[in-house]
Amino acid sequence: MQEALALFFGSESLLVGTIIPFLFVLTVVVFVHEMGHYLVARWCGIGAQAFSIGFGPELLGFTDRHGTRWKLSAIPLVGYVKFIGDESETSSPVGVNESALSEEDRKRAFHTQPVWKRAATVFAGPAFNIILTIAIFSVFFALYGRQIADPLIAGVQPGSPAAEAGFEPGDRFVSVEGEKITTFADVQRIVSGRAGDKLNFTVERDGKMVDLQAVPKIVERTDPLGNKVKLGAIGVETTEAVGNFRRIEYGPLESVGQAVIETGHIIGRTGEFFKRFAVGREDKCQLGGPVKIATMASKAASQGFDWLIQLMAMLSIGIGLLNLFPLPPLDGGHLVFYAVEAIKGSPVSGAAQEIFYRIGFLLVMGFMGFVLFNDLFAC
């Protein structure tokens, strides 16, 4: 009996070691996303009927003085905010039953608002996810600073792309693909996502600028959480003596600035990844679903609470960006409809919305099935 309890409730058990960290991270990210929708809707004068974390049967909840039902539902993988008059899947004014709404409800209904208010409300969810990531990074930069190294080459691996391109120990990176380089991590950031691409490098050698070209090759590395990841590399390294390893400390405003820059880099790398993935140039196993996220949450929790919060930051921006994909079931799909409405002066027809919604729904379900298959069988 004790062994059974330890298996389920012990610190390394399925419940405590995996399920609780996973639900903690996911619930916070989903809550922030939906809170973005809710707060901006309130600021725009839109009424909310329900705010739910999860879907399915309600487990517990309460109704506030504004008439909004706040609830925790049985399946805590997603969340939603149900606005007054928001009856259709596409959150459009087409097909809404006006007679079912009172005069007061019509004033506060989602579909009666100007298109910019509806667009702002929809965009706020992904935006709040990105803001959460920036906030977490800001705290970490303020507390821990950043470890950096000068962009100096200490060694070149024989037979590597760098060796074939003519890189030499002592070279200092000046730019990669026209982007100015200030730390060795800048080089790693650019090169890691460009395996197979011919990249242009400028290095300083003996006081002179030298232009070189190299094609990063794919290498498999183990990240701090023990995950196998495939990255681009050219085969150069630095050392503490050559690279002058050091920690930079940041004040509050500097921390926010660094967090914004880091978040921008992540957005850029994510866009580059999906662009390459669409043409078959990225490893499909780099995409994971709930099983992979749960595994990562378990590993992060075992490393410490700060690791779990870092995972939350990465998951938050991932969900924010995913929701901006221009497919109708997602926030990005709604924004496309609103953009068309703003341009032509009237909503997209109900028939057209229905067609695009069905296509988008199938694509989203296909993507979810793909990543789940990766989780369970392929990777």
From Swiss-Prot:
It is found in: Cell inner membrane. Its EC number is 3.4.24.-. The chain crosses the membrane at residues 39-61, 122-144, 305-327, 355-377. GO terms for biological process: proteolysis. Disulfide bonds: none annotated. It is a multi-pass membrane protein. Residues 133-208 form the PDZ domain. Its main location: membrane. One of its GO terms (molecular function) is metal ion binding. The active site is at 34. InterPro entries: PDZ (IPR001478), PDZ_6 (IPR041489), PDZ_sf (IPR036034), Pept_M50_Zn (IPR004387), Peptidase_M50 (IPR008915). Its cofactor is Zn(2+). GO terms for cellular component: plasma membrane. Zn(2+) binds at residues 33, 37. Keywords: Cell inner membrane, Cell membrane, Hydrolase, Membrane, Metal-binding, Metalloprotease, Protease, Transmembrane, Transmembrane helix, Zinc. Pfam families: PDZ_6 (PF17820), Peptidase_M50 (PF02163). NCBIfam families: RIP metalloprotease RseP. This is Putative zinc metalloprotease BMEI0829.
